Amino acid sequence: MANFVEKENIFLRIAKYLFPWKGDKPAEIIRKCIFLGAAVVLIVSLVMIISFYGSTAQDNKLNEQISSLYHGSASVTIDPVKKDELVKEYPEVNEEFLPLLEQNKDVIGWITMGDEDSPFVDNVVVQGDDNEYYLDHNLNGDYSKTGTVFADYREKITAENTPANIILYGHNVNTGEYFARLTRYFNYRTQLNYGMDWYRKYPTITFNTLYRKSTYKIFAGMLVNTEEKDGEVFYYLQGRKFKNKAAFDDYVAQILDRTTFYTDVDLKYGDNLITLSTCILDYGIDARWVIFGREVREGED
């Protein structure tokens, strides 16, 4: 009984020390409230951090599985009936996409950048019915903080149509996945091997759709405001199609006026473009870092 009373007294003393108590002076009540507020903030922050990295770890595991399906490092067996159905639905599809289409028919391609044996971008690309869903959903349709790389829904990528400018969106994830390392083309942190050094090492983008394989030469990169309150807004998303040469030339000129680095890549009306867009939180929640590429022409190195 004595031990029980002693334990009860210990808990009571702890409670009186931590929580406002009858008889406390105003200064003591303020101290306890500040302490409790800080403790709540710390606990919530820890829960959010654990949740983020736990979710990211799950997403990374899923991405590894998806990558093994596409690159053929996993043993893949598609049900013959299902395969026949997919081939009938997508008669011109490159066969390496069939296992991914079996999982999700929004799949439209695969993007790769970097060294062949250790790319810094290596992701499946989907195209949905809007530009919102895949911001926070993975390929399986489950909620995901890191989402999935996706193409702008307004210009459909089909066997018959390759948009004049394919626009892809991907998150800038703290752990370095998805489009995080695109910001290395921008030497805003004055890191060695960033900016032009990074461009010289990795000057191209490989984007294979269900129907064609393409390499793009990077020709520009820029920091973009999306809200007028933050300064000039360049509506780079409007350059999805070009009604004539003048429209194309004007769009390219505006890009080259704003780029943070310069290349010797030439452009002409009729070239297919690719645009990669990601957030760059160092400049605010509404800022974007955007990379532009031009498809390698037939017969060009």
Where are these regions (language model features)?
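Solvent-exposed, non-transmembrane regions of membrane-associated and secreted proteins
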Residues: S45-D301
